[in-house]
Amino acid sequence: MIPLAKPYLTKDEAEAAHDVILTNWVTQGPKVAEFEEKFATYVGSKYAVALSNCTTALHLSMIVAGVGVGDEVICPSMSYIATANSILYVGAKPVFAEVNPRTYNIDVEHAETLITNKTKAILIVHQIGMPADIDAFKGLCKKYNLKLIEDAACAAGSVYKGSKIGSHSDLVCFSFHPRKIITTGDGGMIATSNEEYYTKLKLLRQHGMSINDRVRHDSTKIMFEEHVVMGYNYRMTDIQAAVGVKQLEKLDWIVSERRKIAVQYLEAFKNIESIILPTEEEGYFSNYQSFSIYLKPSCKINRNDLMQVLLDNGISTRRGIMTSHREPAYLDLGFKVDLPISEDAADRSIVIPLYVPMEQYDIEFVIKKIKNLV
């Protein structure tokens, strides 16, 4: 079976985790701090806060941005459900915007039509590693005095207008799930250059505790913690962080290798009239966290049948990006919205295998089977 994705993990990560275990300091210790510092340097932010996953990163971003009960946050429905869920967690309402039909990223013009006096923030998503139009949304947020939050779960290593994703705004949330570009088993990170946010985020991830174990460990005097706000247990372990440090060292190489495979797919499928391929706008650099193709209505096989035939031939695939407003959990909450572009893209897109290292034979086999079927 050719898998859809798999992490690039080697002896380096195993030894790093092993070394941490031998220290007996396995959570919120020096490796977490090292990973945060190196990640911030990599993306170009002043600070980074390591967390248990990207969903918790989104949740805390909502809190520090001041989003709460009665507020509205504009976001795409076409995204993994955690995007919208993070808004509900704080008692606010996700207001679903349409996506751009070329990039499948949130459409700035439609988003502007949804702004009301209840709108508190806009949550943009860099879909499967393709940067959204950050400058356009920064301008929109400035115009209406809104907060901008970036769901960059899939976008580690992606570049927007010459700068890494993570350097453009004050709350940028990353994921280290195994399907992402780099992994810590699971994990998340918030990149920020806002010192006030940074201070609050560190409190919130550890039950609102005024000091952490590392500070107390290094002190020559006894210290007693205070819990100054209601917080959460959203901490990353040092075992995960040690793996993350090693993964981060390989990130640019992994992105380069993924792009080489993406180029092969783009070249192989470029003349097939029945499909639409990913679009990388000028000044945008995708890490190709996933490679998604869209099947036009003229395609001789529908998406679900194509997925089944490929599975029968030993090729794992997934549907394209979901639409949250059509999931049972959101239907039960009464969300009814008309988003024809998002719905059509979700119903007609398919994600095909892409990982590092991927054998050339497997790449060619995937190409051959898809070309024969579509």
Mark where each language-model region is.
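N-terminal "arm"/small-domain region of PLP-dependent enzymes with the aminotransferase-like
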Residues: 1-25, 30, 226-228, 353
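Phosphate-binding glycine-rich loop
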Residues: 25-72, 86-90, 96-98, 163
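PLP-dependent aminotransferase class I/II
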Residues: 33-37, 42-49, 109, 121-125, ...
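Hydrophobic residues in well-ordered beta-strands that form the structural core
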Residues: 69, 75, 96, 148-150, ...
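Conserved coil-to-alpha-helix start sites within the AMP-binding
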Residues: 79-84
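Helix C-cap/helix->beta junction micro-motif
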Residues: 90, 143-144, 313
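Short beta-strand->loop structural element characteristic of the AMP-binding/adenylate-forming
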Residues: 93-103, 318
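Active-site phosphate-binding strand-loop segment of PLP-dependent enzymes
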Residues: 102-184, 189-197, 302, 355
